[in-house]
Curated annotation (Swiss-Prot):
Domain of life: Eukaryota
PROSITE patterns: IG_LIKE
Biological process terms in GO annotation: adaptive immune response; cell surface receptor signaling pathway
Keyword Nuclease among UniProt keywords: no
Keywords: Adaptive immunity, Cell membrane, Disulfide bond, Immunity, Immunoglobulin domain, Membrane, Receptor, Signal, T cell receptor
Pfam family, one: V-set
UniProt protein name: T cell receptor beta variable 7-8
Compartmental location: Cell membrane
SUPFAM superfamilies: Immunoglobulin
A GO CC term assigned to this protein in UniProt: T cell receptor complex
UniProt main location, coarse: membrane
Biological source species: Homo sapiens
């Protein structure tokens, strides 16, 4: 059987502040082989202290993964397994890491920020 590819579509909630700048995520799209490690980056709106990650499977609504207040990860109850990790070491940019990707990880990953 050939190697299966997973398609990762990364979009952001486009919140805006007085400058019109919004949440930025990269990469915008990611295709990974099963078993590959993936890192997704979220740049929140400047000045926002709260940051949220969500996962949206095909045909489903967004589901909560984790929540940060500055650099502190206050709730990670939604992270689905020990292969998912999130960090925000400087209280600004956050990274969601998925190790050893599996077919069921294929989803839209959303990041949002707030004051």
């Amino acid at each position: 059987m050939g190697t299966r590819l997973l398609c990762w579509v990364v979009l952001g909630f486009l919140g805006t502040d007085h400058t019109g700048a919004g949440v930025s995520q990269s990469p915008r799209y990611k295709v990974a082989k099963r078993g590959q490690d993936v890192a997704l980056r979220c740049d929140p709106i400047s000045g926002h202290v709260s940051l949220f990650w969500y996962q949206q499977a095909l045909g489903q609504g967004p589901e909560f993964l984790t929540y940060f207040q500055n650099e502190a990860q206050l709730d990670k109850s939604g992270l689905p397994s020990d292969r998912f990790f999130a960090e925000r070491p400087e209280g600004s940019v956050s990274t969601l890491k998925i190790q050893r990707t599996q077919q069921e990880d294929s989803a839209v990953y959303l990041c949002a920020s707030s004051l």
